[in-house]
């Protein structure tokens, strides 16, 4: 049969059939009848289209190939024979330009005269049986069906045969000739008997041997073999059956499947209440750095040495005082803690040799700030079985918080470029195999786009702080160790730079389990006046500690310097993930890579270079109240990175729940956009599951707001 196909059909048709079989993982050496069927179908599609044009008056005309008028517009667009990605691109383009409804399955042709998609069928069985199978599969009035048989019969939707008698006769003659040629070679009977009904990809996959025996053994009760089960599944009408089963479960269960229409979804309800507050473990856009360039001091690289060197670059220290107290805390203790840090740093400088680490004196203010002796005494359960009113602590429900504009500002800032490089090329990892040449190119392009990004600074800052805190928690369990918050970068000129953001003082840290908490006090420099957005700084006590001279276009100006102080806590598992924040670079690189792969698949060549170097092209970045925001490929890289970084910085059960539940709604909306006519039951239950995750977390509230923008614009 394979030899016959190669002799009987045009080489271009044979090549397209080979590609189609390869795409579905089928072996043409084994599936020879299928190979012949695909070639026949392709040839009929091409013959259907051949010689048919539309003239300037919009009339359909038949023109032979050597006619000088062959530059007229083709009447039919051929979709069959293209790879799936390209075929869907063509279908989408036709739908966008003509307003045609998007089909669920790939059709074979589009008729520009009648403005409809056409599904061509070639059958070795009765035409009406094959027609009904096609119609049952497509379930669309907008796709026209035209079936031909090898016996000269045909059948079409509403008996509308589209083409003139002569064109159809040419197709029937060709099919009859193919049948005769096969019969002469003794191939026809095998070919005729091999046709099955309309198949899905899963049905084409034949299971044999051990896997077949396992499949037969793994069936639900009352099914003797896989064929019976398949026949049952194929004829299964889900809606009524599921409703019937659920109604047996409980009288309260009502699972009527409702159609999901453009008017069905409502916006997610965001909570009311006071504005949400900053809850990250360190300051983000409001952080201020004291920096040294080209560090070459003694002990360079030892955090405490670097910190002292950075502190010496600032000369505007003044007597600190509280400008924004913490509502519930003993604020003088925070002030005394900062004064203690300054005093003990001064003591170090007065020593002959600076130590590598510094353990703070266990003063009353630090004991209070670090919760020393505040934990309730643990009692073994066996010792209190007889206590009649034994119960857990009553815990208050968390207070609902509303979305505040500061979190969107934080995200926007994270997407921006800084004037420093925060990662070297090797942060994402070296090549392992020579095949990774393209991967290297993509990594280098991506690194160039994100190395200056503020989100990348947050990654390196997070990695440093979590590593230092976990080390100290293990090495100095009983000590109140002073940990400088440091990062390293390179300037535009390539000079090394060491930055100090502030200090952490670690509490007692006997961390046996992954979730055991170590308390710490963070003290971070900033130029942001907390009185501008006091709700953001609810958990902080803010001191004014100095005045900083800043150079600007109009000369020097003095700005007050603040210290943001708060008590916080973390655990071994959180620090472990914080140390691995570089994973965010990989995650966003993979997302960009899938975009490149999609583009390369359409163009059938690697598009990495064009993707990054075509500066004129814009890409969708995300939703906003204004609609879909577009930006350069660099902006897309930085936005994806910032999202990944914020997922790490603001990780919480609320985020986990919201991501999982909102994804279900997103998939239903996407199915609606793809014209898949989705149905749902208990949609309000899904909304409840989403909305119970919206409590007080700023990042979750912002994501919910973005989701509402997406709903608004997706369903227009």
From Swiss-Prot:
Mn(2+) 2 binds at residues 80, 108. A motif (Nuclear localization signal 2 (NLS2)) lies at residues 184-247. Phosphorylated on serines and threonines by host kinases, including human casein kinase II. GO terms for molecular function: endonuclease activity; metal ion binding; RNA binding. The keyword Glycosyltransferase does not apply. It comes from the Viruses. InterPro entries: INFV_PA, PA/PA-X, PA/PA-X_sf. Transmembrane segments: none annotated. Binds 2 manganese ions per subunit. Its EC number is 3.1.-.-. It is an enzyme of class 3 (hydrolase). Its cofactor is Mn(2+). Mn(2+) 1 binds at residues 41, 108, 119-120. Keywords: Cap snatching, Endonuclease, Eukaryotic host gene expression shutoff by virus, Eukaryotic host transcription shutoff by virus, Host cytoplasm, Host gene expression shutoff by virus, Host nucleus, Host-virus interaction, Hydrolase, Inhibition of host RNA polymerase II by virus, Manganese, Metal-binding, Nuclease, Phosphoprotein. Gene3D superfamilies: Influenza RNA-dependent RNA polymerase subunit PA, endonuclease domain (3.40.91.90). Plays an essential role in viral RNA transcription and replication by forming the heterotrimeric polymerase complex together with PB1 and PB2 subunits. The complex transcribes viral mRNAs by using a unique mechanism called cap-snatching. It consists in the hijacking and cleavage of host capped pre-mRNAs. These short capped RNAs are then used as primers for viral mRNAs. The PB2 subunit is responsible for the binding of the 5' cap of cellular pre-mRNAs which are subsequently cleaved after 10-13 nucleotides by the PA subunit that carries the endonuclease activity. Influenza RNA polymerase is composed of three subunits: PB1, PB2 and PA. Interacts (via C-terminus) with PB1 (via N-terminus). Belongs to the influenza viruses PA family. This is Polymerase acidic protein. It comes from Influenza A virus (strain A/Hong Kong/1/1968 H3N2). The lineage of its organism: Viruses, Riboviria, Orthornavirae, Negarnaviricota, Polyploviricotina.
């Amino acid at each position: 049969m394979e030899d016959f196909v190669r002799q009987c059909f045009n080489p271009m048709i044979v090549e397209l059939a080979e590609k189609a079989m390869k795409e579905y993982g089928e072996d043409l050496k084994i599936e020879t009848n299928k190979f012949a069927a695909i070639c026949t179908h392709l040839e009929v599609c091409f013959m259907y289209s051949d010689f048919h044009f539309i003239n300037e008056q919009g009339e359909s005309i038949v023109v032979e190939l050597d006619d000088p008028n062959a530059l007229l517009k083709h009447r039919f667009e051929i979709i069959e024979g293209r790879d799936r990605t390209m075929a869907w691109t063509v279908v989408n383009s036709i739908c966008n330009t003509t307003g045609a409804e998007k089909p669920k399955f790939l059709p074979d042709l589009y008729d520009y005269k009648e403005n409809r998609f056409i599904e061509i069928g070639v059958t070795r069985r009765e035409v009406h049986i094959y027609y009904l199978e096609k119609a049952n599969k497509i379930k669309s009035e907008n796709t026209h069906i035209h079936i031909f048989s090898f016996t000269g019969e045909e059948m079409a939707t509403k008996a509308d045969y589209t083409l003139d008698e002569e064109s159809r006769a040419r197709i029937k003659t060709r099919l009859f000739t193919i049948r005769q040629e096969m019969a002469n070679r003794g191939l026809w009977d095998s070919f005729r008997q091999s046709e099955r009904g309309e198949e899905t990809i899963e049905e084409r996959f034949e299971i044999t041997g051990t896997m077949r025996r396992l499949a037969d053994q793994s069936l639900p009760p009352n099914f003797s073999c896989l064929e019976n089960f398949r026949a049952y599944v194929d004829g299964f009408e889900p809606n009524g059956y599921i409703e019937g089963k659920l109604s047996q479960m409980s009288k309260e269960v009502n699972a009527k499947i409702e159609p999901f229409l453009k008017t069905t979804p409502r916006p997610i309800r965001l909570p009311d209440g006071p504005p949400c507050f900053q809850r990250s473990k360190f300051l983000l856009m409001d952080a201020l750095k004291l920096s040294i360039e080209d560090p070459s001091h003694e002990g360079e690289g030892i955090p405490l040495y670097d910190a002292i060197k950075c502190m010496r670059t600032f000369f505007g220290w003044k007597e600190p005082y509280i400008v924004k107290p913490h509502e519930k805390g003993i604020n003088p203790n925070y002030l005394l803690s900062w004064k203690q840090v300054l005093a003990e740093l001064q003591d170090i400088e007065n020593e002959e040799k600076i130590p590598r680490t510094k353990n703070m004196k266990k003063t009353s203010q630090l004991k209070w700030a670090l919760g020393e002796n505040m934990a309730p005494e643990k009692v073994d359960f066996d010792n209190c079985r007889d206590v009649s009113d034994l119960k857990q602590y009553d815990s208050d429900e968390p207070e609902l918080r509303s979305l505040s504009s500061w979190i969107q500002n934080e995200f926007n800032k994270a997407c921006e470029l800084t004037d420093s490089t925060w990662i070297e090329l090797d942060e994402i990892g070296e090549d392992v195999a020579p095949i990774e040449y393209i991967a290297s190119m993509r990594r280098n392009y991506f690194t160039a786009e994100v190395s200056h990004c503020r989100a990348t600074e947050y990654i390196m800052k997070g990695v440093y702080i979590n590593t230092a805190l976990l080390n100290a928690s293990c090495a100095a369990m009983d000590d109140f160790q002073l940990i400088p918050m440091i990062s390293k970068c390179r300037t535009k000129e390539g000079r090394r730079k060491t930055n100090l953001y502030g200090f952490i003082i670690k509490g007692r840290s006997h961390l046996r389990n992954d979730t055991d908490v170590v308390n710490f006090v963070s003290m971070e420099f900033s130029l942001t006046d907390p009185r501008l957005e006091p709700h953001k700084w609810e958990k902080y006590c803010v001191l004014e500690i100095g005045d900083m001279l800043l150079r600007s276009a109009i000369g020097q100006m003095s700005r007050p310097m603040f210290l943001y102080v708060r008590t916080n806590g973390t655990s071994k598992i959180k620090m472990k993930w914080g140390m691995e924040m570089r994973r965010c670079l990989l995650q966003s690189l993979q997302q960009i890579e899938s975009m490149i792969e999609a583009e390369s698949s359409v163009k059938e060549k690697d598009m990495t270079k064009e993707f990054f170097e075509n500066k004129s092209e814009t890409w969708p970045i995300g939703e906003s109240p204004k609609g879909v925001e577009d930006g350069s490929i660099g902006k897309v890289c930085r936005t994806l990175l910032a999202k990944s970084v914020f997922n790490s910085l603001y990780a919480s059960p609320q985020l986990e729940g919201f991501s999982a539940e909102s994804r279900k709604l997103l998939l239903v909306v996407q199915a609606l956009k793809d014209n898949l006519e989705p149905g749902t039951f208990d949609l309000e239950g899904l909304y409840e599951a989403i909305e119970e995750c919206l409590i007080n977390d700023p990042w979750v509230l912002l994501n919910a707001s973005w989701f509402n923008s997406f709903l608004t614009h997706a369903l227009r």
